[in-house]
Structures are given as structure tokens and as C-alpha cells.
């Protein structure tokens, strides 16, 4: 069976507005279930692909800061 996770996630969120997308992200993080990690990864990939260099730099800096707090 060939499951294309990206396509499934894109299909699930394709009609979502900003509030629904935010709720999806917040719920996945607060829930803390590992099964949600691939979905968050796909969402991050979309964000990354649609960000300019400055936004990417800010995300990396934020990530570095968060990693240092672990």
C-alpha cells in the first residue's frame, strides 16, 4: 500500500482558514502525541517553502534558542 502522507495532510487542511490552521498546530503540540509529529513536519515544510530568507533566518534563530532551553 502506497500512502502519500503529504497528500493526505494537504487534503485534510486544504480548506482550512488561519484559525483552523492555528488550532491544528496548537492542538498537535499540546496533545504531545508522537503520531502528530509527521503532520507538524509537513506543515513546517510548507511554511519553510513559502518563507523568504529573512523569515527562514528568524525561524532558525528561534529554533536555536528553543534547543538551548531544552
From Swiss-Prot:
Q: What's one Pfam family the UniProt record gives for this protein?
A: SSPI
Q: Which InterPro entries does its entry note?
A: SspI
Its induction note reads:
Expressed only in the forespore compartment of sporulating cells.
Taxonomic superkingdom: Bacteria
Localisation per UniProt entry = Spore core
Q: Which cysteines are joined by disulfide bonds?
A: none
Q: Which UniProt keywords apply?
A: Sporulation
| Ranges in a coiled coil | none
Establish whether keyword RNA-binding is in the entry: no
GO aspect biological process, one term = sporulation resulting in formation of a cellular spore
HAMAP family, per the entry = SspI
Tell me which family the UniProt entry assigns to this protein: Belongs to the SspI family.
Q: What is this protein called?
A: Small, acid-soluble spore protein I
Q: Which gene encodes it?
A: sspI
